[in-house]
């Protein structure tokens, strides 16, 4: 699973997810991308499930770029524990995703196969997504 090697503070505040993505909203590496349309936490397990789904669809052709990383820990108390007694133990790692963020990119394959792979990966995520294509105007990527 994806997780940071080390962090300064293990336990974080939950935070708020308001507004759109600040960066990472353009397809920079591949030709096709999967763009988030809603705010949500994406877990390391969901990212891994998408990675497996895409690589199985692409087989040995093309290249995959994962543009999100789970760098935020979330905590949970054990079942049937009483309230209080401090913050729970770290349960897992999530990536905070806002609308407009590119989650995955694919390059080196035709459009039909790229769409098939990204549509299959989108079923593994808890958010609405959209498949976007790299925009090129006058030979330059925008």
From Swiss-Prot:
Entry keyword set: Ribonucleoprotein, Ribosomal protein, RNA-binding, rRNA-binding, tRNA-binding
Gene Ontology MF terms in the entry: rRNA binding; structural constituent of ribosome; tRNA binding
The keyword Methyltransferase is assigned to this record: no
The keyword tRNA-binding appears for this protein: yes
CDD domains, A to Z: Ribosomal_L16_L10e (cd01433)
Top-level taxon of origin: Bacteria
A Pfam family this chain is assigned to: Ribosomal_L16
GO biological process, one term: translation
InterPro entries with a match to the protein in the record: Ribosomal_uL16 (IPR047873), Ribosomal_uL16_bact-type (IPR000114), Ribosomal_uL16_CS (IPR020798), Ribosomal_uL16_dom (IPR016180), Ribosomal_uL16_sf (IPR036920)
Gene Ontology cellular component list: cytosolic large ribosomal subunit
Similarity field: Belongs to the universal ribosomal protein uL16 family.
Oligomer status and interactors: Part of the 50S ribosomal subunit.
HAMAP family documented for this protein: Ribosomal_uL16
Protein function: Binds 23S rRNA and is also seen to make contacts with the A and possibly P site tRNAs.
Name this protein carries in UniProt: Large ribosomal subunit protein uL16
Organism (species): Thermosipho africanus (strain TCF52B)
